[in-house]
Amino acid sequence: MGQKRKDLSHAELMMMTIADIIKQLIEAHEQGKDVNLNKLKTKTSAKYGLSAQPRLVDIIAAVPPQHRKALVPKLKAKPIRTASGIAVVAVMCKPHRCPHINFTGNICVYCPGGPDSDFEYSTQSYTGYEPTSMRAIRARYDPYLQTRHRVEQLKQLGHSVDKVEFIVMGGTFMALPEDYRDYFIRNLHDALSGHTSNNVAEAVKYSERSLTKCVGITIETRPDYCLKRHLSDMLSYGCTRLEIGVQSVYEDVARDTNRGHTVKAVCESFHLAKDAGFKVVAHMMPDLPNMGLERDTDQFVEFFENPAFRPDGMKLYPTLVIRGTGLYELWKTGRYKSYPPSTLVDLVARILALVPPWTRVYRVQRDIPMPLVSSGVEHGNLRELALARMKDLGTQCRDVRTREVGIQEIHHKVRPYQIELIRRDYVANGGWETFLSYEDPEQDILVGLLRLRKCSEESFRPELKGGVSIVRELHVYGSVVPVSSRDPSKFQHQGFGMLLMEEAERIAKEEHGSWKIAVISGVGTRNYYRKIGYELEGPYMVKRLQ
């Protein structure tokens, strides 16, 4: 056999290896054994004398159809990617100058990227070396190609790409000219539905009926590009979540880092956005110039307890010093110094302990490759280190993401046992917020959540005037289940969403005294609400409460 093996080409050996791996996987599955895939790949590759291991994509592609259902979920690369039930596709708009250069004369001191920087082909606030930027540059910033490529890539890795959420990155999208924005959003919807549209409204109409559903679009923006006209535009795009760059709650820090807007603007934009039904995710930067540990901790206490802020989600980006920025000059001349790594882990651990149970921490650091960073975060796994530090301190992180059923299952192999409805009320941004969730309180696992808001009097959308409650988010966690099928072991489509909606309608009618309830719904999920008696009014799905 050894002689024969030498005559075979590399490709043939590779095929034999893959076939052998799949055979062993099927046997293990039939015997109900757990397999260490990496060990299996190494062993089998060595057996056939290969220097390189077969790629996961090739193994997944070669699984015979009758075994796909059993094997592909086990082979899935990076299960966290769809653990929350949705495949996230990040796309970037073309590089453009930062909008506030016109009136502050310069960009923020810590900001890399943009058309004038060392990294000239990158968008504002990105270096062009992050995975998303590289994909965007490869597609020449074409939204259609970025979407198609990423969806295909996730499919090859064994994920179910049935529900897609877009994140529009690359500086302030809303500062771009209107015709470019329309072209961009139109192409995102068209890439999923396969239709070629002439305008956004048409694209949205076809996207509603697409097989791959767009369940939401997230747009990154600044508080000064989050005014009424911007919010109305974003509603027409099918956008459901905003990421607003706050960075700091201190007026002097916002001024000295050259943000070009005040903290008051932040509070106002939060208020307007929540009254239009958006979910608000704030970007926060600890470790900015003239802060210090005390002020940094205090600002997060303020951020979560002051009703003028209280976001629905947060991305935590510890400050990085990157060449070509104003901060780099301060750092080189010794006028700015980053926290030592252990202090930073301490700070992040403290911040995570402050996060209320209705807030989701999406990220704990930027996706910037280490060689570009002159000073700042030294570890790639800051969240893990912070969670380990919290264990030592005896505190725990109770944000939405840590308690999600899908993520708990991947990390701790824990499944919920006794699920009950839990309700939390709080006041934020001039409105009454109710956070409803189905949880297993014993093990602290979250299965589904709903955010309900009694709109304040100042709501500017005509659909939401005069005693209307709005559901800003409905999400049942757990692995993606295609929209039409039911899998009894997974938590989507088990009716939790329906139960949450019924409770929300009851609260809106009996406690808020509202005559109508509205839902800000992703374009692809509108049919779900149609089934339970809602109809489209403007960008919202609404229902009269008798």
UniProtKB/Swiss-Prot annotation:
Q: Tell me the route in metabolism or biology where this protein functions.
A: tRNA modification; 5-methoxycarbonylmethyl-2-thiouridine-tRNA biosynthesis
* Keywords recorded for this protein, A-Z: 4Fe-4S, Acyltransferase, Cytoplasm, Iron, Iron-sulfur, Metal-binding, Nucleus, RNA-binding, S-adenosyl-L-methionine, Transferase, tRNA processing, tRNA-binding
Q: Which GO terms describe its cellular component?
A: cytoplasm; elongator holoenzyme complex; nucleus
- Cofactor(s) the protein requires to work: [4Fe-4S] cluster
What Pfam families would the database entry show?
ELP3_N, Radical_SAM, Radical_SAM_C
Q: Name one GO molecular function term.
A: metal ion binding
Q: Please tell me where acetyl-CoA binds in this chain.
A: K163, E473, L474, H475, V476, F496, G497, M498, Y529
PROSITE patterns per the record?
Answer: GNAT (PS51186), RADICAL_SAM (PS51918)
N-acetyltransferase domain sequence ranges: 395-546
**What SMART domains does the database record attribute to this sequence?**
Elp3
Cofactor binding annotation: Binds 1 [4Fe-4S] cluster. The cluster is coordinated with 3 cysteines and an exchangeable S-adenosyl-L-methionine.
Q: What class of enzyme is it?
A: transferase
Which positions bind [4Fe-4S] cluster?
C98, C108, C111
Known EC number(s)?
Answer: 2.3.1.311
Specify whether Transcription regulation is a keyword of the entry: no
- Annotated GO biological process: regulation of transcription by RNA polymerase II; tRNA wobble base 5-methoxycarbonylmethyl-2-thiouridinylation; tRNA wobble uridine modification
User: Key word Hydrolase present in the record?
Assistant: no
Ranges for domain Radical SAM core: 81-371
Catalytic reaction(s) noted: uridine(34) in tRNA + acetyl-CoA + S-adenosyl-L-methionine + H2O = 5-(carboxymethyl)uridine(34) in tRNA + 5'-deoxyadenosine + L-methionine + CoA + 2 H(+)
| InterPro entries xrefs | Acyl_CoA_acyltransferase, ELP3, ELP3-like, ELP3-like_N, Elp3/MiaA/NifB-like_rSAM, GNAT_dom, Radical_SAM_C, rSAM
Going by the entry's taxonomy, the superkingdom of the source organism is recorded as Eukaryota
Protein function: Catalytic tRNA acetyltransferase subunit of the elongator complex which is required for multiple tRNA modifications, including mcm5U (5-methoxycarbonylmethyl uridine), mcm5s2U (5-methoxycarbonylmethyl-2-thiouridine), and ncm5U (5-carbamoylmethyl uridine). In the elongator complex, acts as a tRNA uridine(34) acetyltransferase by mediating formation of carboxymethyluridine in the wobble base at position 34 in tRNAs.
Q: Which family does it belong to?
A: Belongs to the ELP3 family.
- In its UniProt entry, what is this protein called? Elongator complex protein 3
Organism from which the protein derives: Gallus gallus (Chicken)
